[in-house]
Structure formats: structure tokens, C-alpha cells
Amino acid sequence: MSFIVLVNGYRCAKNTDDTLGAVFSDTAIKRIFGNNININSPENYANQTIPAYINADNGRVIDDKKATLGRVLFYDKALSTNGNIACASCHQQEFGFSDTAVQSKGVNGLTGRHSMRLINARFAREAKFFWNERAATLEAQTTQPIQDHAEMGYSGLDGDPDINDLLAKLNALDYYQELSAWAYNQSDSKKTLSENNLQECLGAFIRSIQSFDSKYDEGRRQLANNQNNAPLPNFSSDENAGLQLFSAPPIFDNLGSRIAGGLGCGGCHRAPEFDIDPNTRNNGFVGSIDNPTVLDLGNTRSPSIRDLVNPRGHLNGPLMHTGSITSLETLIGHYNRILVRPGNNQIDPRLTPGGFPQQLNVTPTERQQFISFLETLTGKAIYTEAKWSNPFAL
């Protein structure tokens, strides 16, 4: 059972457990995870505080038990054929659940695109996942890397084992026998994990990874819920100027050159979620990661642009599906003067005003103001919070 409560401007999803009093074995859980997992007092994933001004939510109701099981799955290298790669290998907590490598290393080679950050994956208007939106939901996405030959190896093709081989391996492990019985309320310990269970639990854990304790959020909480682009009382003058540059649309001349207004970033990455507009087309980055001369036009999904940098001010890994942007200055440079490759007939029209590639004419002062604003979107807890950390680390 579940219900929603609204308290002091925040909303929380409250879950009740219909099986209170049931007793579950945790001998293997204690042996493997020590004090990192306590089934008698699981971490709070379901009832986290969500600011009342956050509206976009593509998620399902999160269950603490299933998210706990999802945390184990996320960090377990047993999900790869050689036992060396976990989901967390490419989505590292210290880097905002991103990867500092341009291409992540899998069991049989490198990934075909840069690994996306997973922060606030739930809080987006776009429900599809992957850069090219090939997964209809986050849950559908979670087992595709497992079944990729290069990434985790359970493809079932050309001699690879398949997902059923993985399930047999996991169901033979005593800690999964205990965790799955507990998560699915089957005290007889006869619960076996299915692919749907993996998707549900991994999805619950990833959906729980949220970041709403940034400087931006501290100021945003002081305004009315619909004041997404208003100056924030805790911001410096440069940060507020950067916010306005981000939010305000540019005014172009008849050749696509900006003569007034802002930079228009909020047209595709709307505050306060800073997610991607579901109707966005590509942003001009259309090269393939392995061969920049080969066009890869369909990459229209983006993670939230919250936590682009970590609390130390360092970029949380390279940006774009090619991983070719390695600084915020380079990011601004790309949008400052859009280059439309021959054959790119799917570029977002917001980047080609009047049919001309945009020229934003960003000044050095505007560049620094814009970067100052982007740095206010960095949270704190996600980088160190134990409930999102590696439970195998004793």
C-alpha cells in the first residue's frame, strides 16, 4: 500500500508494509555485506524529500526493499560474464554516477557511447532512456547493458551466455536467495529472480538517486513554486546573471546572430528539473564515438544538467554521447557557434534560427556568469551518501 503526503512545501511518497512481522533469514546477507545492509531497518529510498516545485516525474513508486536489492545488483560484478564489471563500473558515485572515461571498459571491449550520468533520472519529462532513446523506460534500459556483448557479456549471441544463464547464477547465490525472499515478501526463501525482477529492482535503486541539496535548491525553496526563472535570494550577482542567461531566449538578427536576450538553454533544459525536452532533436554532435566521420544522428536524450561538476568544481566526466566535451568552456563554445555537419537533417530547429546555425556571441563576462550558475546546480549528498554506495565494501 502507498499514499502521498504533503508537508511544509515538500511531498513524500509513504509506503506501508503489509507483511510486518514476517521473519526472513539474513545469515548470508550479514556475511557478505556486514552492517552495510540491515533488512530489519532498510535505508530510506521510498520516502525521500522531494521539493514541492519539482513537477516532472517519470517514475514508479519506489519500494525500500526492492531498491536495496537493486543497490546490490548495481554494484555486483557477478552481473558480468567475467566477474569484473558492474553497473557501478561505468556509473561511479564519486563522479555523480558517471564515468570519467570517454568510453567505458566492458568485458569484451569498449562501450559505443559515453556512459550517461544517472542523477535525477526519475525527474524528467522524457520517459525514454539511452542517448538515442531506444529503451521505452528506465526499467527496460537496466538489463540492456547486461545483454550487450561488449559491456557485460550476456548477449546470448555468438557463443555468449544469455540472460537466463545469469539468472541461474544469481539465484544460486545465497545472498540473493535471502534478499529476493525479503524484497518480495516470500519468507519460505523460494523466490527466484526473473529479468523483470532485475529491471524492477535496478530501476528502483536508480530512481532513488536524487540531488536536491544544491545552492540553487537552497534559494529556490524560498520562492513560490511557479517562479522557476526568478532571481534567487542566495545567489551572487554573477550567479543570477548566469541564471537569466540560461533561462531567457536569445533574440537573433535575420542571419542567426544573437543581438540581445539570453542564451536560451532553458528551451531544452527547463528549470527546475533541468531535464531534456522530450521533443528535442540532436544538438549538432553527430559523429560516432569510434569514427567521427560516420554520422550518428539520433542522439536526442540527455541526462539532467544538474551536477555537471562535483563539489570540488571538477567536471563529472566528459559530456555528450561522444565524450568529446571536457570542460564547461568547451561546452559553451559548441553552442556559441553551432556547426551543422553535411547530412545532419535532424538538428534541433532551436539551434538554427531562420535556417542559419546560431551564433550566440557570448562575451567573456557572460561565459563566466554562465559557468557560475551551472556550478550552483551541484548537490552534496549524492557523492557520499551511504545508501547509494557500494554495499560490498566492508
Regions found by a protein language model. Name each.
Residues 14-144, 217-336, 341-344, 386-394:
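Short glycine/threonine-rich turn/loop motifs
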Residues 163-182, 186-188, 192-212, 321-394:
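C-terminal capping alpha-helices of c-type cytochrome domains
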Residues 121, 128-172:
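Glycine/proline-centered hinge or cleavage motifs at structural transition points of membrane proteins
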Residues 1-5:
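Bacterial N-terminal signal peptides
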Residues 10-12:
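N-terminal Sec signal peptide cleavage junction
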